[in-house]
Each structure stands twice: as C-alpha cells, then as structure tokens.
C-alpha cells in the first residue's frame, strides 16, 4: 500500500449495502479493510488485490477495538469508516421473541457504537477522517411483518 492511496474500513461488508460499497471503493482504487462475521465471504472478496479481510462480530466491543488496531497497524492510516453492520428478523407481533429482538439491537445499535468507540480517539488525535453510519429503510418506516 502506498502512502497516497485512500484507505477505508467497512463493516457489514459480507452482503448488501456493505458489500456493494466495498466493491465500489476497491474498483476506484481505495485500499479497503472489510469486516463482518462471515469469514469465508470476506476471504473470497479479498481475492481482489484492493480488499483485505478482517473478520469481526461488532457486538463484541473488545473485538472491535482489537480489529481496528490491527487494521491501523497494517494500513498505517484510515481515511474513512463506513459502518453498515445490521440484521433484520421480520416477525408478526404474535411471534416476537425478546432474545432475538435484543440481538437485533445489539448488532444494529450497540454494534455501531462499539465501532465508533473503536475509532473515535484515532480520528481525534489525527485531526481528520470521516465516519459514515448506514442503515436500511427499516429504520424509517414500518415494513410488513416487522412489528
């Protein structure tokens, strides 16, 4: 990696918006660190010479910190973080499962906070960089079977 290359960390990169964003940035020549729980998909994506796999479960705060430290050690710097991790479990009101609902909150809300917490000190000390948080339409309006 050269010093002039832009560098990005993307979570939720194994599918959906995160995967599409990772592929787009890699195509444009960015060095892309990708994270998600599904290591086998990340490793397949890392066949692209601009993509590097860093498996991660965003629910684990320490894992978020350690993964970011590993990325910084290897990339030397990060210009942009895009946090796309999310999960969706559509249920009718009679099928709601508290344990699953807590898991959705852990990933979609607390997982993002864990990632922001992992990078905030780095960006403050560097006096630069950007964080983007991506969610789906599910956060703005109701969808069928999403009580």
Spell out what each predicted region is.
Residues 84-89:
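Conserved NAD(P)H cofactor-binding loop of Rossmann-fold oxidoreductase domains
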Residues 48-62:
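Rossmann-fold cofactor-recognition segment
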Residues 94, 141-147:
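Active-site loop immediately N-terminal to the catalytic Tyr-X3-Lys motif
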Residues 14-15:
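Conserved glycine-rich cofactor-binding loop
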Residues 92-93, 97-105:
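Substrate-binding pocket helix/loop in short-chain dehydrogenase/reductase
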Residues 28-45:
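Conserved glycine-rich Rossmann-like NAD(P)H-binding loop of the short-chain dehydrogenase/reductase
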Residues 136:
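Residue(s) in the substrate-gating loop at a strand-loop-helix junction
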